[in-house]
Amino acid sequence: RVNSDLVGKVVNIASRCAGFIGKGFDGYLAEQPDNPELLAQIQSFKDEIGDLYESREYSKAIRLIMALADKANQYINDKEPWVIAKTDKQSPELQAICSSGINAFRLLMCYLKPVLPAMTASAEQFLAIEPLRWDDLDQLLVGHKINKFKPLMTRVEADKVQAMVDATQKEFEELAQTKAESPAPAAENTTGFEDEIEFDDFAKVDLRIAEIISAEHVEGADKLL
């Protein structure tokens, strides 16, 4: 299920649009996407998906991302860019439609980066962009030149994807544990008195009183009797 979602939904968005952009427009995206409403809808889930990652609900986050991918794929199905390309490979409409698809792909890959960093790195090379950051979800690629599309992945086993998710979750948990175990910095002493030990610690001290019965001079010593 995870495998078909990743390949058939997210990556397929790029593979369906990149060829038209490369052949008809020398790799350049349109200055204005065809469907800014769709892209705005994908962007609107930035906080919700971020919160799901923060609460370690990775499965819910991925399901939501895949639902957004469904919307992007449906948009491409409805617009049928391949039909437009048959009559005009340099149609501005074709460029705008495929630019919307590429931008949707970029946004979805940004959402997936916390759990699929290696795959996202390949997407970044294809998109010819700097490493994606969460704040990049607020921006779109316009008038930008992308590279030739190469298959980002041909097969991803569900257990491997789950292993990636588990590894990411483990890193979060280890970081949280480290923070929890780190001792809080000692409070600065502003009383003017030396620090005192707790009574419980004082009670553990073995104090004994001894009576000196006799004392004799120690030969060669100038400070001892």
Tell where the protein language model's regions lie, with residue ranges.
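Long, charged, mostly alpha-helical binding arms that flank functional sites
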Residues: 1-96
